[in-house]
Amino acid sequence: MTKENIKLFSEMHAEPSWLADLRQKAFDKIETLELPVIERVKFHRWNLGDGTITESEPSANVPDFTALDNHLKLVQVGTQTVFEQTPVELAEQGVVFTDFHSALEEIPELIEEFFMSSVKYDDDKLAAYHTAYFNSGAVLYIPDNVEIKEPIEGIFYQDSDSDVPFNKHIMIIAGKNSKISYLERLESRGEGNAKATANITVEVIARSGAQVKFAAIDRLGENVTAYISRRGKLGNDASIDWAIGVMNEGNVVADFDSDLIGNGSHADLKVVALSSGRQVQGIDTRVTNYGCNSIGNILQHGVILEKATLTFNGIGHIIKGAKGADAQQESRVLMLSDQARSDANPILLIDENDVTAGHAASIGQVDPEDMYYLMSRGLDKATAERLVVRGFLGSVIVEIPVKEVRDEMIATIEEKLSKR
């Protein structure tokens, strides 16, 4: 794939010159930059991008939309948007939820201001690749002082019959003092077995006083090798409450970051992960405290089955000048197989004195006494293990603020465990 192909893609979609030029600059950087560092995860030989910027054809793997609640929703299959729903009262308040290129026409100044602002195009090789080659996406914009009580859904299906790269850029711009609850699904759909790559970047911009509840359930298929980056950038007194279920079937590296720029900003990152088969999942979860009295909490629990690998890196970094900041983290992994591999790495970087910080990490097998107790009550081994896993992950799931997300995450865990 040459720069000319990327230029043609920009022209075909009538992209503004600033974006077309940025794609070209990013392309030039790809070969000179290193891959991001995910400690103790060897992914340098993975195929995380084949250098194409094609679009998918309309798919037969399209869900039925005959019975839907009337709330804000967008659904894409591959690069195609197959459903958009914006209630009239929200549209009248200036709320926008649409595909990326439509948003470039509707709110061009905001896209130019915030696109690739929480992650820079030249941060690393995968960021540059994403900027040059992303082929679809979505934008959610909530104006200042708008509060949406109903959950907002962004559903992004990867077509299992297609080898078109699943390279999406998703932006959420939450205006000052706005309040939303957003649920995102990344999911392979269909019975196909085409091999594909995914490079997904999600930027959440929480402006001063904004409150964002962001939940995600990732269920990409075993033939999808993925890099998933979710980045939050928080203004004064803004908050993002992340709840992410990493339930993919293929090899995945993920980077979940929150930059607490504003004074009094607050980010909670709750991550639940399940690895099975021979898959490798490596997850970096980072909170960086820039603002005074900013608070960042990381809570992540994972379960490993069979010969899988799961790595948690929890990183708390308090920048010089962030007086009164607090960074706490906990990473725990439960192994249900003696052939599984795991790491849980707590990392604290403290550049300021007047702060508080702490960490905890553990890796362990299922407690034999727990299993004995449950099986002595008449449960078979598989059912007993499922209950132990539910209890282990439940301490994180119970902290998720949206009931529908809790229920769906539990159902997803049950589904994965039942395949054993």
What name fits each language-model region?
Residues 390:
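Short, conserved phosphate-binding/catalytic loop or strand-edge motifs used
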Residues 1-128, 305:
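N-terminal amphipathic, basic helical "cap/leader" segment at the start of enzyme domains
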Residues 96-379, 393, 397-420:
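Conserved beta-strand/loop scaffold segments within soluble protein domains that form the structured core
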